[in-house]
């Protein structure tokens, strides 16, 4: 795209920049959310809560399934 095209698209630059920033934020959030080390830490904490009696077996199973699903699925591929 030449100089003329760049000049015509200049008013949309803030929107393109905002969209790029949002894509970067989403990618980083997914990376942290699906990080196996973070999921393992949450599983360990969940086990501690169960052993301390702060949650019951049903709650433990539900939350454990959610965490294991996160490990299996991983971040969405784009």
Swiss-Prot record:
GO terms for cellular component: gas vesicle. It is found in: Gas vesicle. It holds the Pfam family GvpG. It comes from the Bacteria. Its main location: other. Coiled coil: none annotated. Induction: Gas vesicle production is induced by growth conditions that promote production of secondary metabolites tiancimycin A and B. InterPro entries: GvpG (IPR007804). Keywords: Gas vesicle. This strain probably produces some gas vesicles from the probable gvpO-gvpA-gvpF-gvpG-gvpJ-gvpL-gvpS-gvpK operon; it can be induced to produce more under certain growth conditions. Belongs to the gas vesicle GvpG family. Might be a minor component of the gas vesicle involved in nucleating their formation. Gas vesicles are hollow, gas filled proteinaceous nanostructures found in some microorganisms. It is not clear what function gas vesicles perform in soil bacteria. This is Gas vesicle protein G. It comes from Streptomyces sp. (strain CB03234). The gene is gvpG.
């Amino acid at each position: 795209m030449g100089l003329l095209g760049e000049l015509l698209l200049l008013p949309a630059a803030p929107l393109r920049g905002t969209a790029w920033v949002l894509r970067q934020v989403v990618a980083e959030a997914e990376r942290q959310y699906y990080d196996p080390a973070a999921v393992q830490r949450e599983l360990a904490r969940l086990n501690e809560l169960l052993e301390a009696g702060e949650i019951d077996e049903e709650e433990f199973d539900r939350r454990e399934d959610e965490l294991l699903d996160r490990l299996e699925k991983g971040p969405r591929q784009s």
